[in-house]
Amino acid sequence: MKRSKTLRAADAKVDREKLYAPLEAVRLAKETSTTKFDATVEVAFRLGVDPRKADQMVRGTVNL
């Protein structure tokens, strides 16, 4: 499937080998967005905890 000019330009801005800082990643996500509505971004963190143990449960939300 052929990709549009907009998607190719957005893909060229992202270096897939680089680890981005959180602020830079959010800026890049907003800059390369092709939608005309507020999109959702999911972030996953590896915390190294055992979710089966009640004292190690981690939950929360963040507003950007």
From Swiss-Prot:
Function field: Binds directly to 23S rRNA. The L1 stalk is quite mobile in the ribosome, and is involved in E site tRNA release. Protein L1 is also a translational repressor protein, it controls the translation of the L11 operon by binding to its mRNA.
GO terms for MF: rRNA binding; tRNA binding
Family assignment?
A: Belongs to the universal ribosomal protein uL1 family.
Corresponding gene?
rplA
InterPro entries, sorted? Ribosomal_uL1-like (IPR023674)
The UniProt subunit note reads as follows:
Part of the 50S ribosomal subunit.
Question: Which keywords does this chain's UniProt record carry?
Answer: Repressor, Ribonucleoprotein, Ribosomal protein, RNA-binding, rRNA-binding, Translation regulation, tRNA-binding
Q: Which domain of life is it from?
A: Bacteria
- GO biological process entries: regulation of translation
This chain's protein is named Large ribosomal subunit protein uL1
Q: Which GO terms describe its cellular component?
A: ribonucleoprotein complex; ribosome
Source organism of the structure: Streptomyces lavendulae
